[in-house]
Amino acid sequence: DLDFHHYYGLTELLETWLKTQKYTIENEQDILALRKSFIDDNWEKVYDYTVTLCHNHHLRLHSIYGKRPKLITAEKQKRWVEKQRQKYGMVR
């Protein structure tokens, strides 16, 4: 089984962005209205800083960095994944 992982967790990223922009979300319409701006402002973190991992390594990553890793751990997560790939090879 393969899992998709964002080094910059979307929940943490969105919450930080909302605070920075001084936006509040009250309902689904608010989310839809802000979605494009959020993605435009965070394109790389949403789409480029991602990885596909086997399920076991994904669970291990979260056991180390937590269920909702802090944004400041993104580079550490990326290095950890690179080390795992050096040790175990790429998932095929």
Regions found by a protein language model. Give the residues of each.
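Extended charged
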Residues: 29, 45-51, 55-92
